[in-house]
Amino acid sequence: MKSLFPVVFALCMSPVVWAETAISAREVQKAVEQFVLAQVESELPEDARPVVDVRWQGDLAFAADGAPKIRVRRTSSRPLRGPSVMRVGIDVGGQTQRKMSVTADVRIWRPVVVASHMIKRGEEMALVGCELAERDMT
């Protein structure tokens, strides 16, 4: 056992350089946001405005050589509305280095007609008390 210690110590202290690849949290968020917007924009009316809030924190680092590629895919066929889980894979040199689940909160904002005062059941509406405002239609 005593003879094993110098060998392990020498290996740990050897000048081997590990290439470390890092991906920032903002890069992951941006990739998920672009994927979601590409999926959602074709289904929406022209006056709708999608807003995507990606819930991912922390940078990722792993030992690998090459440029990282971020893959994003859906986990279900449900429409992307509200909190939706995405699968994210990070590949370097054709090898998957990391897989994770990321939540994207998708909100659809659209202009709608709203009343400026409370309307009772059966009350007739007039355009005087209404205005056009943008609201969350998710």
Which positions does each model-derived feature cover?
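Mature, extracytoplasmic segments of signal peptide-bearing proteins
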Residues: K2-F5, V16-T138
